[in-house]
Curated annotation (Swiss-Prot):
Gene Ontology CC entries for this record: cytoplasm; nucleoid
NCBIfam families: division/cell wall cluster transcriptional repressor MraZ
Record-given protein name: Transcriptional regulator MraZ
Annotated source species: Paraburkholderia phytofirmans (strain DSM 17436 / LMG 22146 / PsJN)
Pfam families with a match to the protein in the record: MraZ (PF02381)
Domain SpoVT-AbrB: 5-51, 77-120
Binding partners and assembly: Forms oligomers.
Localization per Swiss-Prot or TrEMBL: Cytoplasm, Nucleoid
Entry's Gene Ontology molecular function annotations: DNA-binding transcription factor activity; transcription cis-regulatory region binding
Keyword entries, A-Z: Cytoplasm, DNA-binding, Repeat, Transcription, Transcription regulation
HAMAP family tied to this protein: MraZ (MF_01008)
Length: 142
């Protein structure tokens, strides 16, 4: 399970260094292989390959009226491998789709990650906190 936020930097080639606390898990779980695709909220999703295959199969079974979502998730997916330095390459197309420049935030979201432009994530997080908790969390106990 992946959790926590990491402030990272994309290098000039679009490579991102995976935080060391996740590298061993990604090597063990996925042999360093990950899949990156678009997320409807304007960030990118980064899956260890076995988790991607589960997600991909769910998306593939969506009904015909969700064909555009299949295109968004599956048609934009790119398989990448961590290099010897623990970096993954985020393609130019996906960097553009996620609005990623240089400063990024990698969020561990359980079985996958979200990759955000750092400023965009900070603004969206601040807006969500200003709105207060949604009804779904009203009975949630901390």
């Amino acid at each position: 399970m992946f959790q926590g936020a990491s402030a990272l930097t994309l290098d000039a080639k679009g490579r991102m260094s995976i935080p060391s606390r996740y590298r061993d898990a990604l090597q063990t779980q996925a042999e360093g292989r990950v899949t990156i695709t678009k997320h409807p909220d304007g960030c990118l999703l980064l899956f260890p390959r076995p988790e991607w295959e589960i997600f991909r199969d769910k998306v593939d079974k969506l009904p015909m009226n969700a064909t555009w979502w299949k295109r968004i998730f599956l048609g934009n997916a790119m398989d990448v491998e961590m290099d010897g330095a623990g970096r993954v390459l985020v393609s130019p197309e996906l960097r553009t789709a996620g609005g990623l420049e240089k400063e990024v935030t990698l969020l561990g979201m359980g079985r996958h990650f979200e990759l955000w432009d750092a400023q965009t994530y900070a603004a969206k997080e601040q807006a969500a906190m200003a709105e207060g908790m949604p009804d779904a969390l009203k009975d949630f106990t901390f």
